[in-house]
Every structure is written in C-alpha cells, then in structure tokens.
Curated annotation (Swiss-Prot):
Annotated positions binding Mn(2+) 2: 131, 319, 402
Keywords, ordered alphabetically: Hydrolase, Magnesium, Manganese, Metal-binding, Protein phosphatase
Family that this chain belongs to: Belongs to the PP2C family.
Compositional bias segments (type: Pro residues): 343-360
Residues covered by the PPM-type phosphatase domain: 91-411
GO cellular component: nucleus
Protein name: Probable protein phosphatase 2C 49
Length: 416
C-alpha cells in the first residue's frame, strides 16, 4: 500500500521528458540523498549515552556537502503487559535526507529515558526535530542542549516535592526550556565574529550569526501522556484509531493570531514568496533569529495529551514533509508499514531488524554531517524505519523542495 502510494506520486511528478539525460542525472542526485547512518539503542545503563540522529538544514547558498541522512530505531519494549508500565519502552525510527537542498540543516535528537533519576513516575523519552535556517548552527545547538535544558526545568518544577507525586506543569517546563535554549543561541550569536569552517556563515559579509535560527518540535513520551512543545513550522501528529490528531499547529506569519501578535509588537508581515516576517522569515516563531526579535519569538505552544488504548504512532517531521504530505496520508503510510510487519511483539521478544549500510560520514563538521551517537549496530526496527523512510521518499516524489526529517514512534501496546 505505502509502496504503491510512492510509485503513484513519483509517476505523477515525472514529466514525459524524464527519459532524457537531465532527468536521469536529477534522479541520480536524488538517490544520493538517501545514504544512511543507522543503529539501535539498547535501554540505557547508568552511564550509557543517549541516542542521537544528527544532521544540519536550509538555504540555497552553495556549501560543503558531507553525509546525507540518519536512521535509527529503538528496541522492543522490555515490559508492558495490560497496562502502560513504568518500564515501557517505545520503538522508533528516524530518517533525514537532503531532498533538493545542497546542505542538510535539519537536526534530530532521540534521548530515551532522558529524565532518568529525576522521576519515579515511569520512563519518559525525548524526541526532537529541529529545522534550521540560515545555517545549521542553532539546529545543532538545540539537538545537543534542548533535552538537558528541559531536564533542568523539570527538576526545578519538582524540587521539594515527592518525585512520585509531583505533577509538574509541563507547559511551564517546556516554556522555560525553550527560553533558555533561545538565550543560549542569542549569546552564541553575539560572541561569534565569523562562521565556522565549511559553513555558509563565512560567506556573508560581514558574517551575521544572528541571522541563524531553527524551528523546534519536541515530544516527551511517557507511560500515560504525550507532551508536545512546538515553535515554528515543524509538526507533531498523533495517529489514534486511524485518525490523525495534530498535536501542534504551524506558526506561520499569516496565521490570524500570529499576525496580530506580530503587528502588536510593531512588526509587519510582507508577502514575498509567501507570508514572511518583515519579508524575510517564513515562520513566526523560532529559536534564534536575534535580528527579528521581538516579532519572532521562541515561546512554544504546548499540548499535553493523555495516552489511549487505540494510539498507534506519533510522527514528528520538518516542513519538508508537511508541505507536500497531509496528516491523513502520513498516518496511512505508517499504518500500512505497521500492518505489513505484523502486530507489536509481546514483552521480551525481538522485532524484525532492517539492516542498513554503515555510516556515510561519521565525523563532526560544519553543518552537513549525519552522525549517530551511542549506536553499536547498523540495524533498525523494521516497521518504524520503513515508515520513516517511505514518508521521506513520498515527500521527495511529491517535489518537496526542502530537507526532510521524519521521526516515527510506535505507541501501540504489545500483543500478549
């Protein structure tokens, strides 16, 4: 089913002249964008490093191109049973591709059990997609620091309370975490006098690091609820009983409430290749972008959703996917992949693994690398990895002009 969708969209998008040499060259370049660094993360030990799938994102200025994408997946849930137990462990898959961009400016962060030692109310898992613009610096900073700042805010929220009974206001926790992330990005931008090697900041004269920013959509998945915080136009969608439930709303400058907020702050929305803040930025909220403050704010919108028996999956993705794929279609692709791989395994059983090529460029660099940390094996949960990859391919087939990063989290209960 999912493969048929991709083939149909590819057929629609390719003109009759695609048989020519130019079209063949384009397809070859597109295929090059699907190199992977992959792995599976075991449940963390006391000092185990959390998993990260890493990349970079946006703009059309030529720059160095290194690795191209990342795919990683979580292992089988070690224990679940009839209830969402405190040791519940999600499966997940990640795909990031260049698409039609010269550079990768997306970044993805996967941090299993990231509140370890801070709560006794069950394991909580952090998933984040960061879509950079101007360069990948801020997206990479969010990738490395956002989960740590959320942990700090969480600890302060439960300070002086019994950890098991503490029910922190997640809205406040996320807002403080995002605010500190924005402060760090602003301080970094002011301290820079030029770009890093092999990044586009150095191509600007003078180098303007305060022109760099990133969207941020973050999900904290726990045994009983899913918390989503969003700033920008990346998106989180929950699939529940086959019906897509948006857990975030894109921050576009022409969204009525955002337009009023920008005007109240003294800014303007100019329609130049779409609605843009001051005719520049195509989103109304982001981390960084110091030169557009206070019109562009980092304050996230936060939703807290109680988990249900018929939850199937959570999809986080950059606008490279959502610009061309509807919520309904994305959910159907994931459900088709889940059906083809069978029901979730019972506790203690291994899922089928999809073995992928070794990393294509695993060293850090100036914004175009794909790095997976804390991974020992080149393998991925098949259902989640298939779903994430198919969604990325579908976006490319539908002529997405951006980097595409997709995270698929399996929320289904295991079959006893």
């Amino acid at each position: 089913m999912a493969a048929e969708i991709c083939r149909e969209e590819a057929a629609k998008s390719m003109p009759a002249a695609a048989a020519g040499a130019t079209a063949i060259a384009r397809r070859r370049r597109r295929v090059e964008g699907f190199r992977f660094a992959a792995g599976s993360l075991e449940p963390p030990q006391e000092d185990a490093d959390a998993g990260v799938a890493r990349c970079g994102k946006r703009q059309r200025v030529a720059g160095a191109r290194a690795g191209a994408g990342a795919a990683t997946a979580g292992p089988c849930r070690p224990s679940a049973g009839a209830e969402f137990g405190s040791r519940w462990w999600p499966r997940y898959g990640v795909t990031s591709v260049f698409g039609r961009r010269r550079e990768m400016e997306d970044a993805v962060s996967i941090r299993p059990d990231f509140l370890r030692g801070s709560t006794s109310s069950g394991k909580h898992h952090f998933f984040g997609v960061f879509d950079g613009h101007g360069c990948s610096h801020v997206a990479r900073m969010c990738q490395d620091r956002m989960h740590e700042l959320v942990v700090d805010a969480y600890k302060k929220a439960v300070s002086g309370k019994e950890a098991a009974a503490a029910a922190p206001a997640w809205k406040d926790v996320m807002e403080k975490g995002f605010a500190r992330m924005d402060d760090e990005a602003t301080i970094w931008a002011k301290s820079r006098t030029g770009g890093e090697p092999a990044c586009r900041c150095e191509l600007q004269t003078p180098a303007r690091c305060d022109h760099v920013g990133s969207t941020a959509v973050v999900a904290v998945v726990g045994p009983n609820r899913v918390v989503v915080a969003n700033s920008g136009d990346s998106r989180a969608v929950l699939c529940r009983a086959g019906v897509p439930v948006p857990l975030s709303v894109d921050h576009k400058p022409d969204r009525p409430d955002e337009l009023e907020r920008i005007k109240a702050a003294g800014g303007r929305v100019i329609y130049w290749d779409g609605a843009r803040v001051l005719g520049v930025l195509a989103m109304s909220r982001a981390i960084g972008d110091g030169y557009l403050k206070p019109y562009v704010t980092s304050e996230p919108e936060v939703t807290v959703t109680e988990r249900a028996d018929d939850d199937e999956c959570l999809i986080l993705a950059s606008d490279g996917l959502w610009d061309v794929v509807t919520n309904e279609m994305a959910c159907e692709v994931v459900r088709a992949c889940f059906r083809s791989n069978g029901p979730p395994s019972p506790p203690g059983c291994s899922r089928p693994k999809a073995v992928l090529p070794p990393p294509a460029g695993a060293s850090g660099g100036g914004g175009g690398d794909a790095v997976v940390k804390g991974v020992d094996k080149a393998e991925s949960d098949k259902a989640c990895a298939d779903a994430a990859l198919l969604l990325a391919k579908l976006a490319i087939a539908r002529r997405s002009a951006d980097n595409v990063s997709v995270v698929v989290v399996d929320l289904r209960r295991p079959v006893p």
